[in-house]
């Protein structure tokens, strides 16, 4: 049996961090399963940091996001030129740069994206919720 691998959308990461019931049972079980490789994009750190700076979000810990991810044993996925180029080339109008980056990473790295954002469906990537 192959090991499951999942890329967390930013809201999934936040909901996991604050133990929010909005996180689906399926995604919660995947994260809790020690055999699942849970991946967090640097784009999520960028998005969270931006929203904290703008006062739109409160990150639940004083630890840096990367340190939190390490404590959770999440893998960190850096953004590459290939990711950036793919994120910029999609023809549809979904304008959120963070979602575009996460979708590009999901497609290129062949990792399903854990998201409940229906707008992501326009990218044609594999999602889990």
PLM feature spans:
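Short, well-structured N-terminal submotif of metal-dependent ribonuclease cores
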Residues: 1-40, 54-67, 109, 118, ...
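Alpha-helix capping/helix-boundary segments
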Residues: 12, 44-45, 83, 102, ...
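Residue-level signal for well-ordered alpha-helical positions
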Residues: 19-20, 51, 90, 126
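Short glycine/serine/threonine-enriched helix-capping/active-site loop
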Residues: 40-41, 79
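Acidic, glycine-centered active-site loop in nucleotide-sugar glycosyltransferases
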Residues: 123-129
